[in-house]
A protein has these predicted regions:
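Terminal, Lys/Arg-rich, intrinsically disordered segments and adjacent short helical elements
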Residues: 1-9, 232-245
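Hydrophobic alpha-helical membrane-insertion signals
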Residues: 1-65
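Extended, aromatic/histidine-rich regions of cofactor-dependent oxidoreductases associated
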Residues: 20-28, 194-197, 379-389, 416-420
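Cytosolic juxtamembrane amphipathic/interface segments immediately preceding
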Residues: 24-44, 122, 188-195, 240-255, ...
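Hydrophobic cores of alpha-helical transmembrane segments in multi-pass integral membrane proteins
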Residues: 45-68, 73, 80, 86-177, ...
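A short, charged helix-loop
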Residues: 176-187
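Functional cores that coordinate and move charged inorganic groups
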Residues: 186-210, 214, 222, 229-232
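Conserved small/polar residues in nucleotide/adenosyl-binding loops
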Residues: 453-456
Length: 456
């Protein structure tokens, strides 16, 4: 009986392969795709980003079934879009968990993407021959920012409304075409029902299609050149008599099993936040967004969601010059674009931070401090002291990129091994100690800042 079932399954597979390259794709991208055998903790976040993308798509579909993109007032003198969200939360079966899954998923999406990008930064995954992989990844980041910004308007709460108003009005700072461009994006002279409808269309259809296309291109480009590893060694250089890399193992089943472990741990953390702290202490869902949008009432403090705050802090840190704020807009845009230019800014011959010299390591630590510091300052009310600190951190941020062609040439690197090396037990213990201290410190620091923010 079992043999008969297997024969039928094989016959079906053969029939499919004759018409569609199913087995070929399986082998090229999983069973016979050889990945370095020394992947570590940092290599979980690529697969986790795919998982969160699926969560966002599925939860978004169910939200769309019950959401109404209408900014006009209903019979209760509340915007229909705002009441649609409240209807989902209160009257739709399981609506509250779908809504929180989507809002929490947005923040977790940026968490795993930022960690994924950081992995590429420390291990030189942007260097030859992976320039296109990095470019596609940078475009994914841009598309993700656009998707998040447009989706942020849809609840039609106070912070959604005024946050969109502030960001869209930034385009009016562009000389000559700015005012017309701002009006064109609005679809009106202000954020209105027209803006809401076009943002809904872009958020639900246009940007997700672009995002999915870029993800496919990113994976195809990665599998064409092969995965990087913590040593920055190209495993394709050393192969056995069968053409198999000596330091490579099949992605399936080895790394699919590894990724399943990562998925389980991630879902435990994700569900813990989802069920017990979906508002993320006011960072995932801000308190003003529980009030309906009111064009006649400005919130005391307008700030973007936490994952945009580093770039928003740079925008605020750059003073107006020659009577225009366009320099802040340029600075904010440059802060994102420079990330995509890393393959050409880095002139060093070594990829991995393990074998980089002290100059690069120092610059990297300063960059991390600057990025986190800007993120914290961007979420807070601007004061003279905070603006000064933000300007200093902005200089550090841009110096990391603009100075890279020079300090990577001057750095003294360590010799790179010909083959990959495995992490020792001591390195693993020290890593988890470092991560634990960092997480606890970040939590305590963020809690203190949140308390100070509430006082302000």
């Amino acid at each position: 009986m079992a043999n008969q079932t297997n024969n039928k399954a094989k016959a079906l597979l053969d029939w499919t392969d004759a018409r569609f390259p199913l087995s070929k794709m399986w082998n090229e991208h999983l069973a016979q795709y050889y990945a370095p055998k020394n992947f570590n903790f940092w290599y979980y976040f690529g697969s986790l980003a795919l998982l969160v993308l699926v969560i966002q798509i599925v939860s978004g579909i169910f939200l769309t079934m019950n959401y109404k993109p209408d900014g006009n007032l209903n019979a209760y003198h509340l915007p229909a879009a705002f009441t649609a969200v409240e209807y989902i939360m209160r009257d739709v079966s399981g609506g509250w968990i779908i809504r929180y899954m989507h809002s929490t998923g947005a923040s977790f999406f940026f968490i795993v993407v930022y960690l994924h990008m950081f992995r590429g930064l420390i291990y030189g995954s942007y260097k030859k021959p992976r320039e296109l992989v990095w470019i596609f990844g940078s475009l994914i980041f841009l598309a993700l920012m656009a998707e998040a910004f447009m989706g942020y308007l849809l609840p039609w709460g106070q912070m959604s409304f005024w946050g969109a108003q502030v960001i869209i009005n930034l385009f009016s700072a562009i000389p000559v075409i700015g005012p017309d461009l701002s009006t064109w994006i609005h679809g009106d002279f202000n954020v209105s029902d027209v803006t809401l409808n076009r943002f809904f269309a872009l958020h639900v259809i246009a940007v997700p299609l672009v995002l999915l296309g870029l993800v496919v291109a990113h994976i195809i480009a990665l599998h064409e050149v092969g995965s990087n590893n913590p040593d920055g060694v190209e495993i394709k250089k050393l192969k056995d008599e069968n053409g198999v890399p000596l330091d490579g193992i099949p992605f399936h089943p080895y790394y699919t099993v590894k990724d399943i472990l990562g998925v389980v741990v991630f879902l435990i953390v994700f569900c813990s936040v989802l069920f017990f702290a979906p508002e993320g202490g006011g960072y995932f869902l801000e308190a003003p967004n529980f009030d309906a949008a009111n064009a006649l009432k400005t919130p005391p403090h307008i700030a973007p969601v936490w994952y945009f705050t580093p770039f928003y802090a740079i925008l605020r840190a750059i003073p107006s010059f020659l009577g225009t704020q366009v320099w802040g807009v340029i600075g904010m845009g440059a802060a994102v674009v420079l990330i995509a230019l890393l393959p050409w800014l880095d002139k060093g011959e070594v990829k991995s931070v393990r074998y980089r010299g002290p100059i690069f390591k120092t610059a990297l630590v300063l960059f991390i401090i600057a990025f986190i510091g800007l993120g914290i300052l961007g979420a807070m009310v601007a004061t003279d002291t905070r603006t000064l600190v933000a300007r200093i951190l902005s200089v550090v941020y841009f110096a990391f990129f603009l100075g890279m062609p020079f300090y990577t040439k001057l750095d003294t690197n360590k010799p790179v091994p010909e083959r990959v090396t495995m992490s020792t037990t001591k390195q693993k213990i020290m890593f988890f100690v470092y991560v634990g201290i960092t997480v606890i410190g970040a939590y305590l620091f963020a809690t203190k800042l949140r308390d100070r923010k509430s006082v302000v």
